[in-house]
């Protein structure tokens, strides 16, 4: 009784606290077990995920967990996901340039025409010790799949041309005269060599308006998320081959295992299969 007075609590309140201790212990144990599942989903394939990505991965593990609960347990156990930062690096190296700027035919209608109709392309950089390497990517705006990519130590135009050639080697049967290749107005895409190559392959060209990143927003989004998820590996890269191997692994992961809310919780490759066949992954059926 004296202890209750010193603590400023009633005797009945003290006994209620004692009686509830078992329930608190049970809740703590349950939280920890659920957190272990969250951590397993977070660590899957070695790339960090936010609460949405964790919920979608848990579903593939046969576990349904409320997103608010996932967020609560992430805060409780200090599990943080990376936050994307704006990309300050917008200027690319010199390349042959023409005054031929294609109109913005796509007009942000990224997902209005189905798969293999609007293909987005852009270049970003990745840090390697005291220098940069450069990644050129082609992304299907409808399925979000990465269809072709090339990594280069140089900003010379060759690797951008090779990205288009890789697209045609691997997806030739899907390409036709209705395909748009949409980019910004960077010097690579206005070059004679690039425009001639598109013409040779009978691919149509569309360009964002100058200084308007929203005109190529899905591609910008991909680069932003990719850089966040690759951040833990940047300081482990010693040479160009290290970066290449990680990019190869990441693109495979992204296409096959990075589930997206926009795609109904499917990965890009799963979504393309669903669009073509009408069949969802078994984990999402029922």
Task: Please place each PLM-identified region on the residue numbering.
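K/E-rich alpha-helical interaction surfaces of small helical-bundle regulatory domains
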Residues: 1-22, 44-47, 246-264
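Mobile genetic element proteins and their domesticated derivatives, centered on retroelements
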Residues: 3-4, 14, 38, 54, ...
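Basic, flexible linker segments flanking DNA-binding modules
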Residues: 4, 13-114, 212, 269-277
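RNase H-like polynucleotidyl transferase catalytic core
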Residues: 83-87, 180-185, 199-218, 234-239
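An active-site-proximal beta-strand-loop segment
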Residues: 108-147, 153-155
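Active-site beta-loop-alpha junctions of metal-dependent nucleic acid enzymes
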Residues: 131, 150-174
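Acidic/histidine-rich, metal-coordinating catalytic segments
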Residues: 174-189, 209, 266-269
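C-terminal domain-tail junction helix/linker
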Residues: 192, 199-203, 225-286
């Amino acid at each position: 009784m004296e202890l209750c007075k010193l603590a400023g609590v009633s005797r009945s309140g003290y006994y209620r606290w004692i009686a509830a201790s078992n329930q608190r212990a049970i809740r703590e144990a349950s939280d920890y077990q659920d957190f272990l599942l969250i951590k397993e989903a977070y660590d899957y394939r070695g790339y960090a995920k936010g609460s949405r990505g964790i919920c979608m991965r848990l579903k593939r593990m046969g576990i349904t967990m409320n997103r608010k609960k996932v967020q609560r347990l992430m805060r409780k156990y200090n599990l943080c996901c990376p936050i994307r930062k704006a990309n300050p690096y917008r200027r690319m190296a010199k390349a042959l340039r023409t005054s031929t700027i294609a109109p913005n035919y796509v007009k942000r209608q990224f997902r209005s025409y189905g798969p293999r109709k609007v293909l987005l392309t852009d270049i970003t950089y990745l840090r390697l010790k005291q220098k940069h390497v450069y990644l050129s990517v082609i992304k299907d705006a409808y399925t979000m799949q990465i269809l072709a990519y090339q990594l280069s130590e140089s900003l010379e135009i060759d690797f951008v041309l090779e990205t288009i050639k890789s697209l045609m080697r691997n997806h030739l049967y899907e390409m036709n005269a209705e395909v748009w290749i949409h980019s910004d107005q960077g010097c690579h895409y206005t070059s004679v060599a690039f425009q001639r190559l598109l013409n040779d392959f009978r691919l149509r060209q569309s360009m964002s308006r100058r200084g308007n990143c929203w005109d190529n927003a899905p591609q910008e989004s991909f680069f932003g998320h990719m850089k966040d998820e690759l951040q833990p590996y940047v300081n482990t890269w010693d040479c160009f081959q290290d970066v290449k191997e990680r990019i190869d692994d990441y693109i495979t992961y992204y296409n096959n295992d990075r589930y997206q809310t926009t795609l109904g919780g499917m990965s890009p490759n799963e979504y393309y299969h669903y669009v073509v066949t009408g069949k969802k992954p078994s984990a999402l059926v029922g």
